[in-house]
């Protein structure tokens, strides 16, 4: 299984792809590889984020899932991986998504791709590693729950991810406030 996110990956893109990676490897006997452009080192605390490939490959996957991509071109240099896969899927939350891939799951009501993924998978199979990554995705696309896309659903899901092991203060401090403090020095 290949996973690809959008160009210039943000916290939701990284959190969603790493969350899905951890969900798949902990529940299914599948080989999985994430493909993303370079991203903020602040996100490397996520379990297995260091295994992400930043280089395209010629490998043909049985399945490639585009995560947090409003259209297929948003995969940038990793689009050929998606196009050459035997089967394709898109998981997204952008209302502008035209629907691409054999299977396309777009939840325009979701605050983030992380929330859309949470709703798509079996929640009782989400482990601590996946919970931390998905929580980071929600936190980033809601601006630490300040943006107008912060909904009751997003807050409820964030609460469930905390129960599954996500550490909110660590994730927020590592990816928001640590950066802000250093920038203000």
What function would you assign to each model-found segment?
Residues 2-59:
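Anionic-ligand anchoring segments at beta-strand to alpha-helix junctions in alpha/beta enzyme folds, i.e.
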Residues 9, 13, 69-71, 95, ...:
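Short, glycine/acidic-enriched loop or turn micro-motifs at the edges of active sites
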């Amino acid at each position: 299984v290949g996973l690809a996110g959008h160009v210039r990956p943000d916290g939701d893109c990284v959190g969603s792809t790493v969350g899905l990676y951890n969900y798949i490897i902990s529940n299914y006997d599948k080989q999985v590889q994430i493909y993303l452009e370079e991203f903020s080192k602040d996100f490397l605390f996520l379990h297995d984020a260091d295994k992400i490939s930043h280089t395209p490959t010629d490998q043909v996957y049985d399945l490639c899932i585009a995560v947090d991509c409003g259209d297929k071109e948003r995969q940038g240099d990793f689009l050929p991986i998606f196009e050459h896969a035997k089967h394709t899927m898109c998981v997204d939350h952008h209302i502008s998504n035209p629907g691409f891939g054999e299977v396309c799951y777009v939840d325009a009501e979701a605050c983030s791709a992380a929330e859309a993924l949470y709703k798509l998978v079996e929640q009782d199979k989400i482990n601590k590693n996946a919970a931390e990554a998905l929580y980071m995705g929600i936190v980033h696309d809601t601006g630490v729950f300040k943006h107008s896309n912060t909904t009751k659903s997003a807050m409820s899901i964030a609460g469930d991810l905390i129960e599954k092991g996500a550490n909110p203060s660590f994730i927020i401090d590592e990816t928001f406030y640590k950066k802000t403090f250093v920038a203000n020095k």
